[in-house]
Curated annotation (Swiss-Prot):
Keywords tagged on the record: Carbohydrate metabolism, Lyase
Reactions this protein catalyses: N-acetyl-D-muramate 6-phosphate + H2O = N-acetyl-D-glucosamine 6-phosphate + (R)-lactate
Active site: E83 (proton donor), E114
Molecular-function GO terms, alphabetical: carbohydrate derivative binding; carbon-oxygen lyase activity; ether hydrolase activity
Name of the protein: N-acetylmuramic acid 6-phosphate etherase
Protein's UniProt keywords contain Acyltransferase: no
Subunit structure comment from the entry: Homodimer.
Domain SIS residue range list: 55-218
Pathway noted in the entry: Amino-sugar metabolism; N-acetylmuramate degradation
NCBIfam families per the UniProt record, alphabetical: N-acetylmuramic acid 6-phosphate etherase, PRK05441.1, PRK12570.1
InterPro entries given in the database record: Etherase_MurQ, Glucokinase_regulatory_CS, MURQ/GCKR, SIS_dom, SIS_dom_sf
Enzyme Commission no: 4.2.1.126
């Protein structure tokens, strides 16, 4: 399929004469088109669920999840992956973003790198992927050579693979165990896939990583109980989480957080189980899921 025939490259009939419209009308059109993104994602929830299960199985075997993309797709990958570390105390090197052109491409456009299929292979090769790992390629067009190189090599290494794209029947489907094709259609500005396509990619990656973290025991109720306390805002958030779960006041929450070295799970377990800090650490070392740890400790 030629580039001009891809839905993401087609002219959107709803936004013709865009340059002649007033500012508010342009904003209204963009908003209306953006509203279609969530509807497109609803159609691929089954495929997203398959990728979530794939990632959970991977992490349970101490594998890694790679995101691979070029341009907007690569930048979106970085935004999702790096935030998992402070939000869920995830160690570095578990969710790994790879962008065509390297990290310099995060802050500026590096031309031509998305066409380097061998570059995609080599960048993934540097991490020595194995059958324990999952590689998720991200490409609005479903055919980006850089992503193709990475996915093809991932299959050769025995990795589980997935493709997130915005077109039906993408060329790279042959290298993916699961294809998530969120058909977002023509952009407000024809071909500007940083808009609806990029938004869809960000939403899907958020859904995948968040659900994986929930199922890996890093959320209790709907609270980020593995949050890293790195600044004053996060310190107050940790206090609020402890207060919400245990019912103690913020001053008491702070006392227990200090005893627990600002580990929210340990602080909660200390308060509700009446065990000391070392005993709570031991319980959580054996059972990191707070809900299950509480069932063990509070009897």
């Amino acid at each position: 399929m030629s580039l001009s025939n891809l839905p993401t490259e087609m002219v959107n009939p709803k936004t013709r004469n865009l340059d002649a419209r007033d500012t508010f009308e342009i904003l209204k059109l963009i908003n209306e088109e953006d509203a279609l993104v969530a509807l497109a994602i609803r159609e691929v929830l089954t495929e997203i669920d398959k990728v979530v299960q794939m990632c959970i199985n991977c992490l349970e075997k101490n594998g890694r999840v790679f995101y691979v993309g070029a341009g907007t797709s690569g930048r979106v990958a970085y935004v999702d992956a790096v935030e998992l570390i402070p939000t869920y105390s995830l160690q570095e090197g578990v969710f790994i973003p790879i962008i065509a052109g390297g990290t310099q491409a995060l802050g500026k456009s590096v031309e031509g790198v998305e066409d380097d299929e061998e570059g995609g292979k080599n960048d993934l090769f540097s991490y020595k992927p194995s059958e324990k790992d999952v590689v998720i390629g991200i490409a609005a067009s479903g055919r980006t050579p850089y992503v193709a190189g990475a996915l093809r090599y991932a299959k050769q290494c025995g990795c589980k693979t997935a493709l997130i794209c915005n077109v039906r029947k993408p060329l790279l489907a042959e290298y993916a165990d699961v294809v998530i094709a969120a058909e977002t259609g023509p952009e407000v500005v024809a071909g500007s896939t940083r808009m609806k396509a990029g938004t869809a990619q960000k939403m899907i990656l958020n859904m995948i990583s968040t659900t994986v973290m929930v199922k890996m025991g890093k959320v209790y109720d709907n609270l980020m109980v593995d949050v890293m306390v790195l600044n004053e805002k996060l310190r107050e958030r940790a206090q609020n989480i402890v207060t919400h779960i245990t019912g103690v006041d913020k001053q008491t929450a702070e006392i227990y957080l200090k005893k627990a070295d600002y580990n929210v799970k340990v602080a909660v377990l200390m308060i509700l189980s009446k065990n000391d800090v070392e005993e709570c650490r031991k319980i959580l070392q054996d059972q990191s899921n707070l809900r299950k740890a509480l069932q063990i400790a509070v009897r």
